[in-house]
Regions:
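FIC/Doc superfamily catalytic core
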Residues: 1-248
Length: 248
């Protein structure tokens, strides 16, 4: 029996995987062999799961999700160096509106079947034109990865891979950070890595902005540095979400 397949090339030169449309195919498993990735992925998953198990995580999930989104949007704007004042709304903040409670379910459903449409919407909300500034083939391959990939490792790593590919390759030019952050949140809800969107990874990335920028710059040569940093951000974001849940 023949199965449809596609090729996704990872950050390192020559690292490509053929992803077949089969239930047991997990295209992101090779990334688990990178230094620190498996342990940090497990820690992030455990931290996020703890928040979701809290009573408030079950009863007041909309409150926690909304607060997470607000904090994430503000931190994302700060990462990009945008001033927050009463007279303007930075593009990064506008992009987060696609995950507002009344839009989240529709955005995630569309992302699962037509990720390019969601990426275009995020880019437009971030004051872009709705298509990548460069490397459209990479965006196409990333979209195929999103729609055809499956597996435990895929569920854990897709959010950080989506973030890394968009931000490190500057696929959407100056809007790449904002698009990457919102797309990563969408992917996390889609795969169940963070099913209700509780974590606030942006705060960690803003506090460690220099390390984040350095990891973006070296992604092609050292993908583990960025992937582990992003997993650290999700774990720290879960701890922040835990505080939100306790106060809810």
């Amino acid at each position: 029996m023949n199965f449809p397949e596609f090729m996704w090339c990872g950050p390192q030169s020559g690292y490509c995987v053929i992803v077949m449309a089969m239930p047991h195919s997990d295209p992101l498993t090779p990334l688990m062999s990178l230094s620190g990735v498996e342990d940090k992925a497990a820690s992030a998953v455990a931290a996020i799961a703890r928040v979701h198990r809290r009573p408030a995580g079950l009863r007041k999930f909309d409150v926690i999700s909304s607060e997470s989104l607000l904090r994430g949007a503000r931190a994302a704007a700060a990462i990009d160096g945008a001033p927050l004042d009463a007279h303007s709304i930075p593009p990064a903040v506008s992009a987060y509106s696609l995950l507002a409670p009344e839009k989240q379910a529709a955005t995630v459903r569309t992302f699962a079947r037509a990720p390019l449409q969601v990426l275009a919407s995020i880019d437009i909300a971030a004051s872009g034109v709705g298509h990548p500034d460069q490397n459209p083939a990479v965006v196409q391959a990333l979209a195929q990865l999103i729609t055809r990939g499956a597996g435990v490792d895929f569920d854990r790593l897709l959010p950080v891979v989506v973030h890394a590919e968009i931000a490190a390759r500057s696929l959407f030019g100056a809007r790449s950070t904002a698009v990457a952050l919102v797309a990563a949140r969408t992917a996390a809800i889609h795969t169940g890595f963070d099913p209700r969107g509780f974590a606030v990874p942006e705060t960690f990335l803003n506090r460690h902005r220099a390390d984040y920028r350095a990891a973006l710059d070296t992604y092609g040569q050292d993908p583990a540095a960025l992937i582990t940093l992003l997993l650290d951000a999700w774990e720290a974001g879960a701890r922040e979400a835990d505080g939100i849940a306790q106060a809810a």
